[in-house]
C-alpha cells in the first residue's frame, strides 16, 4: 500500500458557520451595506446631536425625551458595529431588529416634536432624526428578514464574504436529511410536495431533489479536489467495463419504461445548484451527477467496496451516509469522486471514493 493511501484524507471543507468569533475590523469593512449604512447613521446622528445642543444652549424650549432617544441611537449604532466586528450579526438578529425598532419609535417621536418648531437649529435637529428614522427603517427591513429573502440576497451579493447562510434553509435541509433516513420513497415525495406547497420551494429549486433519474454517467465537476488520485481498481473491473456499460444501458431502458407507465407527470431536475455556504452567485453544472441522488434498483449496485477509514456524514448534506472502518458497502457507478453506495442496513447515499477500496468486480446481472 502506498504512503498516500495510509494517510486519512479530508474531503470536506470547513463550514462558514464554524468561524472564530474574535474581534476583526475586516468583518466590518468587508460588508458594503454595513459600512455605508452605519456611516450614514453616524453622520445623521452628528447632525441631530449638533442641532439639539445648539437649540438647547439658546434657552429655547427643547423636548427633553429627545436626549434619551439620541443617546439610545448612539448605543444602537455602537452595538451594531461590534456585532459586525465579532461576526455575530446572525446570532443576534432578533435583538438587533427589536432594538432598532425601538430607536425608530424614539426618532419618529422626536421628529414630530421638532419638525413644526421654529428656528434653524431645531430644523437641523429634526433633519438629523428624520434621517435616522429612514436608516432605522432600512435596517428593520434587512435584519428582520431571513438571509434567504430576495432583498437580503441582493444586498449580500455585494459583500466580499458573499451571501450569508440562511438558518431557515439549513434547518429545513437537515430535517430532510433526518426524514430521508427513515421514510419510504413515497413519503419522501409527499415531504417534497409539502415544502413546495408551503412557499419555500424557491429556496430549494437549486438543490438536487430525490427524484427518478435514468442517467448512468456520473459527472463530478462540482466535487473537484475530492477525487481518489490512486484508485485501487482491479484488472477484473477494467476487463468488464464494456460488458458493464451494456448491462447498465439495458437496465436503464427497462426502468425508464416502467417509470413512464406508472407516472407520466415526473419533471426533470434543474442542472444547477447553490451550495449551502457559497455566495449564491456561482452556478455549478451538475448534469448527470444528479443520478447519484436517484432511486437506483438493486441490480445497479454491482461493486463491493471496503471502508479504509470511518466516515461521519456531514449534517448539512442530506445525501451523505456514515460508515465504519472495514465495513463492506455495495457501490454503483465508480466514475465520479463521490460514489453512490448502500450499507448492509439498507441506507443509501453518497460516499467519498478516497475513503474506500474496491474489493470485487461487476457481478452478473442475470445470474
UniProtKB/Swiss-Prot annotation:
The keyword Lipid biosynthesis does not apply. It is found in: Cell membrane; Bud; Bud neck; Cell projection. Residues 54-65, 115-122 are extracellular. InterPro entries: SH3-like_dom_sf, SH3_domain, Sho1_SH3. The chain crosses the membrane at residues 33-53, 66-86, 94-114, 123-143. Residues 259-272 have a biased composition (Low complexity). Residues 300-361 form the SH3 domain. The modification Phosphoserine is found at residue 166. It is a multi-pass membrane protein. Keywords: Cell membrane, Cell projection, Glycoprotein, Membrane, Phosphoprotein, SH3 domain, Stress response, Transmembrane, Transmembrane helix. Gene3D superfamilies: SH3 Domains. Forms homooligomers. Interacts (via the SH3 domain) with PBS2. Interacts with FUS1, STE11, STE50 and RNA polymerase II. Belongs to the SHO1 family. This is High osmolarity signaling protein SHO1. The gene is SHO1.
